[in-house]
């Protein structure tokens, strides 16, 4: 018995050392947690090893997903599961569920959410971006004006093409709030280069409070707007969100007065 106990301690210490050497802490935890179950259920050595490795892989994926979420710089954390479909008109759960499969990333396609402020466009864009991070894809989030500022800084530094190439290697860019701030001609040109450079190469998720017919106002040029829309929607799912603002639904502001109250 003493020999067996000492051997068990030696094996435990060796497993701890090996898991540290492999930088696989979840492997040690899984080996300990699953040992009794493996004995009770008469697992083969291969089954026990596979179960332990599965735990380590799952832990690494979860850790990697968290790191990608932080690197994406989302302004908040949102999920598809918590989205309130009842508040909107015409948006089908099936359409959003299909986007949640992330097939559009594999196909290097785009997603566009159109609708008035407060209808959940940014929520859905973030939720898709977070799911992409959890699935192993790199994602970068910023508003349209922030993306333009970033490209303008690169242009001033003489590094615009380097920056565009670097961004082209990111599988998913989330571009929020297209249309909230009109672009000057130079800014519109930079934004066009961003969209054009990703055409059929990588995915973009865009939100806008303006219908496509008014994008000429945003970019100051109907021709530029048409060319941009053409590249953006050629391979894209375009979803229109219709409804009152989430942010105003529990407040009196924004509500239409009744006849009784004038």
Regions inferred by a protein language model and the residue ranges of each:
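Interdomain "pre-motor" coupling segment immediately N-terminal to P-loop NTPase/helicase cores
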Residues: 16, 20, 24-76
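AAA+ P-loop ATPase motor domain of ring mechanoenzymes
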Residues: 50-103, 107-110, 249-256
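Intrinsically disordered, low-complexity and often Lys/Arg-enriched segments
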Residues: 1-13, 17, 254-262
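Conserved P-loop
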Residues: 91-169, 216-219
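Solvent-exposed alpha-helical segments within well-ordered globular domains of core cellular machineries
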Residues: 13-20, 29-32, 50-51, 67, ...
